[in-house]
């Protein structure tokens, strides 16, 4: 598994506060049964959310659509 860093995510969402909110909302979606957009590979929802952000699969649009 490739190591995901905050810097990788900040390349996609430059504002670190927005990036944190996006990761939190997406991790909550995953923890209540949301489908991951990447291969889970036994990762926790927070890591999966960060991987999705770093690959550009999840963005700030999630902030307006709500948590679930």
Swiss-Prot record:
Catalytic reaction equation(s): RNA(n) + a ribonucleoside 5'-triphosphate = RNA(n+1) + diphosphate
Gene Ontology CC terms, in alphabetical order: DNA-directed RNA polymerase complex
GO BP field: DNA-templated transcription
E.C. code: 2.7.7.6
Keyword RNA-binding: no
Similarity annotation: Belongs to the RNA polymerase subunit omega family.
Function: Promotes RNA polymerase assembly. Latches the N- and C-terminal regions of the beta' subunit thereby facilitating its interaction with the beta and alpha subunits.
Protein name per the record: DNA-directed RNA polymerase subunit omega
Gene coding for it: rpoZ
């Amino acid at each position: 598994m490739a190591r995901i860093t905050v810097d990788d995510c900040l390349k996609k969402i430059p504002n670190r506060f927005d990036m944190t909110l996006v990761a939190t909302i997406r991790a909550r979606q995953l923890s209540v049964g949301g489908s991951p957009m990447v291969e889970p590979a036994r990762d926790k929802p927070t890591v999966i959310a960060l991987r999705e952000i770093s690959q550009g699969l999840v963005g700030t649009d999630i902030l307006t659509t709500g948590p679930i």
